[in-house]
Amino acid sequence: MGGDKSIKLNNKSDKPDNIVLKEHEILSKCEGIQHELPNFMRGFFAYLRGNVLPMTRLAYLSDIKFFCRYLIDETELTDAENISDIKLNDFNNIKAVDINIFLDYCRRYT
């Protein structure tokens, strides 16, 4: 298979193999998204890892990535060209009106 990685499943839990495999896929997706996001968010990633279910974590990370992409593509709130280049100060300068505009943007495109 081309570039697909094959993992060897060594399931020592009482969970079915398909569940363990799905959890591994979710965690891999989470790690991939985390690498795309700014480094100043690492503390939040650690919080998510220990306090929410993996699927919830994936949903949160996907939403954060979507918001960061919005900041770059649709606003002048950051000079970053890549999500990982967004600065903490860019987030500090976001105002309530900016969030309301984002929410309106989401309503139009969901």
Pin down the residues of each PLM region.
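N-terminal DNA-binding module of tyrosine recombinases/phage integrases
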Residues: M1-V52, L58
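N-terminal core-binding DNA-recognition domain of tyrosine recombinases/integrases
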Residues: M41-M55, I64-T110
